[in-house]
């Protein structure tokens, strides 16, 4: 595994991960973390959980990974790990109990929409039975449509069962709820997209999908 600590990239072995994992009750995995603010918030709020954040762009994680590695008095969080990796080629993680994919873009968006079943199955493979998932879709990807959405129409709570839920089920994901997020809920996600999205009562910009993996 390639651990990001500021501008440094350090090798992090499976044995080191297992030793760190043994100190916590649960593992939360944030895929496509971007600037890494969301996992920092989760790790700070849940010190009993090991939070693993990964992204294909290591430079975006530099600031928050350096902060997480600092002494606790300076904002350091020993339960937070930033990894340089992609969803297509995950590090050798096991026992993930909660999976977050927030505002996916590019190949990650394509995979989360079911165009890459291998990605969905790969994510399921690192999760324990009945792991929870949260996917937050930035609906601006359909306004106008970006190439990654392909032929998938903009999902809504009314239409999600017609296609996406079935594609998820084939990969071991059970979709149980789909709803629009209010502006304050979008802000609470603490992602780099938060400041760019302006949800309103007459135009919803973020759709949240929740459910279980390996039910």
UniProtKB/Swiss-Prot annotation:
Positions contributing to S-adenosyl-L-methionine binding: 32, 55, 87-88, 102-107, 191-193
Kinase recorded as keyword: no
One example GO MF annotation: methyltransferase activity
Keywords noted in UniProt: Antibiotic resistance, Methyltransferase, S-adenosyl-L-methionine, Transferase
InterPro entries per record: NpmA, SAM-dependent_MTases_sf
Pfam families linked to this entry: NpmA
Root EC class: transferase
GO BP annotation list: methylation; response to antibiotic
Catalytic activity: adenosine(1408) in 16S rRNA + S-adenosyl-L-methionine = N(1)-methyladenosine(1408) in 16S rRNA + S-adenosyl-L-homocysteine + H(+)
Enzyme Commission number(s) of this protein: 2.1.1.180
Stretches assigned to coiled coil: none
Note in the entry: Protects S.hindustanus, which is an antibiotic-producing bacterium, against self-intoxication.
Family the entry assigns: Belongs to the methyltransferase superfamily. Kanamycin-apramycin resistance family.
Role: Specifically methylates the N(1) position of adenine 1408 in 16S rRNA. Confers resistance to various aminoglycosides.
Protein name per the record: 16S rRNA (adenine(1408)-N(1))-methyltransferase
